[in-house]
Amino acid sequence: MQLTYDELTDTLYVYFSQEPVARSVEIDERFVVDYDARGTVRGIEVLDASKGSQGVDIGSLPRHEDLTRAVQKARELPVFAA
């Protein structure tokens, strides 16, 4: 699993697989789920990610347990200014 954040667009992306994306499904205005050709979740895109501190219900997302663990793990990582 890989976690990336684009500060310019305020987008968090959690990669569960390196398989190419076959289709994307917009869950709501903040979440997009990407699937590979087999229908397996490849990743989850969180738009306006910094607004998540106000509370975000991810319970309806596929693999929400994995997403929760990834975000918790990311909070433990040191951040260095360039």
Please place each PLM-identified region on the residue numbering:
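Small, basic N-terminal interaction modules of short regulatory proteins
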Residues: 1-82
